[in-house]
Amino acid sequence: MKYKGMTCSSGSPAFTHLVANEDSFVAERLRRAGAVCMGSTNTPPMMASGMHRGLYGRAESPYNPEYLTAAFSSGSSNGSATSTAASFAAFGIGSETVSSGRSPASNNALVAYTGSRDVISPRGVWPLYPTCDVIVPQTRTVDDMLQVLDILAVKDPREQENFWAAQKHIRIEPVERPDSFPDLSLDSEDSLRGKRLAVPKMFIGGHDPQAKPTFVSEDVIGLWKTARETLEACGATVIETDFPLVSRYEDDSQSGHANNVQGFQPDWNGKERGELVAYLWDDFLKANGDPNYPDLASADGSQMFPRPSDYIPDRYMEQKNFMDYPGLVERARKRQGESIWEIEGIADALPALEAQRKRDLEDWMANLGVDGVVFPANGDVGRADLEQNDASAQHALQNGVKYSNGNRALRHMGVPTVSTTMGFLDGKDMPCNLTFAAGHGRDWQLLRFARAFEMATGRRRKPPVTPDLPTDGIEVKLTEGKGVRQGYSPPKLRLMEPHLDGRTLRLSGTAGLSGDGADVEISVFVDGKSTVAERDDFAWSVVTDFERFVPAKPLYGGYSVHVGKVNVVVIARGEGGVAAQHLSISPEA
């Protein structure tokens, strides 16, 4: 996702130093609303899987590091979800092509929203499969989600850069925006009363002869039974059903492909994963205008998604889903100016996707007389050691575990969903979400359903790996007994060159108001720990020991540029405001 001036590598070594020329639609809206971007988060290369290691590695679970923080095959927004769960930020913004937003939200006890077509513009976000791609806000509560959507769910004035808004092959019914998203919470506790909800048997350990086998652990079945009781206590009727939206889509006996969409031209699946991706990546790079990465044809395809040979998880992944990255570069070289709208088959594909959702979801719901579909977000969680443990890899790559439930069908056909915490798995201390889904345009009803369930349960809990710290609280204060005074300027804060001697760190600097430091309060934090600063008029100094963190060497990929460094934050408070500086110091310096 582009944030002007920051790198936007999409987790790929092929684009390490790619710098965004402007804000994405999402970043633009959030910045205008006063939000502060804390940073970009981890994703696998090109967002094309879940827990493969990208340029900066992968996120690890703040609930239980023995388990993955997202599904292995589709959970690319794992960094966004993990940082939000751990309260690094108030909320996160992910994206999803299969289950890349829903999956890490479930493994991190977060609310996830995947909207109907064109509710949140994806402009400025690296595309993967634009027919599937959707922006996924991730929050700790439904109320937080409503606040975020109040900012993001608006029309993009540059809609020609938004795939579904720009296409001319089928009319997408607009989703009417409520006057106020926060007002959707009003009386939402009763929103499930009198509603009929369908739960697909395949996702709760039942039998659906039309569906592919789906793994569901006893822990998840137990959580579902409790969730069902809660839904019924809220006044809903729950019926067990089939789920043709998924089972028909995944019937590869007809298409021979990973999906079966009636109306696709025979070779469309190859073009959707070939020319369409290549041309969109090419367009993205050209529009960004970084001279070091002018277009896709100049990229190194072999470095887009590198991983070791004989990589254990690859033994159990669907080979038909692997992308030919050097082949995409070659397609861009041979493009000869062809537009994505000139790719043969696209005019049939888009109406076919909309028609299949209407038939297999919306008409099916109408025939059953149900108001929504509800199901556990996943059948189990994968173990973190699957790169070294064959049994862990086999388990993590089963249907029901490798993706969020619903797999690619939900995204390919633009099904809106809202997920919220269902509870925690016994013995694993890992969360699992409950997902609400419905037809196009039913988004706001789903948000109310999720809030009613959340209010009735309150099952989310804080992650134990990142507990509350005294420094987590943001105290609004200046110098003792004083507020910001009119006509006063913030302190002038200066840091000198730090010195490291073994495990001892020496810092010094100055802070003052017009040369006088008497009225300035200095706070120094070394790796999050408060450290006492010695004062001498406007000069200050710190001498402290630190514990050097040496990260484990990953099997492949990298890790954050700040990992293994000493991080220092210095804050100066005066009568005219606050000044702060941050240092990231290498122990070898």
Language model features with spans:
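Structural helix-boundary/capping segments
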Residues: 28, 32, 86-206, 213, ...
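Short helix-loop capping/hinge segments that flank enzyme active sites or metal/cofactor-binding pockets
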Residues: 1-13, 191-209, 258-359, 376, ...
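Stable alpha-helical elements in mature extracytoplasmic
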Residues: 22-26, 76-79, 144, 148, ...
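Charged, often glycine-rich, active-site loop that binds/positions anionic groups
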Residues: 50-57, 248-275, 387
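Acidic carboxylate-rich catalytic motifs and surrounding loops in phosphoryl-/glycosyl-chemistry enzymes
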Residues: 41-42, 237-249, 421-423
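Short glycine/serine-rich loop/turn segments
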Residues: 1-133, 166, 200-202, 206-210, ...
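A glycine-rich phosphate-binding loop feature that marks nucleotide/adenosyl-phosphate handling sites
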Residues: 165-170, 244-251, 371, 377-380, ...
